[in-house]
Amino acid sequence: YNVPSIEEFANRIKTTLKKYPYIVAELNGKIVGYAYAGVFKGRKAYDWSVETSIYIRLDNHGNGIGRRLYEKLEEILAKQGVTNVNACIAYTEHEDKHLHNDSVYFHKKLGYKTVGIFHKCAYKFDKWYDMIWMEKFIAEHNADPNDIIPYPMLNC
């Protein structure tokens, strides 16, 4: 696994912010986590669904930062017109120093449901990992949904 450069990471954030929120949590002036949404599938029919990502520094797990980030992220996404949030989570039957399964339990606590498992589809750290897809509905599925409001156009 290669850690992105600062420039690459900044470009990812800029690209995300063209359409979706990118939320950062700070504690005592240091970044301790972030959450954002991205395109779920690059076709018009899927505009109302997004893929979410979250990262919390390991030493800050369990203190509510992740919950607050996701609550804010989902609140903004619902205002944009998003109906479905999806999370693709690495999973292992036997936890190791690179991967624990806390993210699956975290998402379950926030109301996400497992909708699919891809077995041994991700290879990193010299090991095969499963991927679990989880989803949550954050808004009604109207018969004629409005277009998604890009994040920069939203008045939060």
Protein language model annotation of sequence segments:
Residues 53-61, 89-94:
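A short, internal acetyl-CoA/4′-phosphopantetheine-binding micro-motif in the GNAT/acyltransferase core
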Residues 40-52, 61, 78-84:
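A conserved beta-turn-beta hairpin within the catalytic core of GNAT-like acetyltransferases
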Residues 77-102:
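Conserved GNAT acetyl-CoA-binding A-motif
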Residues 1-14:
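Conserved GNAT-fold acetyl-CoA-binding loop/helix
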Residues 88-90, 104, 108-127, 139-140, ...:
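Conserved catalytic-core motifs of GNAT/GCN5-like acyltransferases
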Residues 13-27:
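A short helix-loop-beta-strand connector motif used in the catalytic cores of GNAT acetyltransferases and
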Residues 24, 30-39:
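Conserved beta-strand in the GNAT
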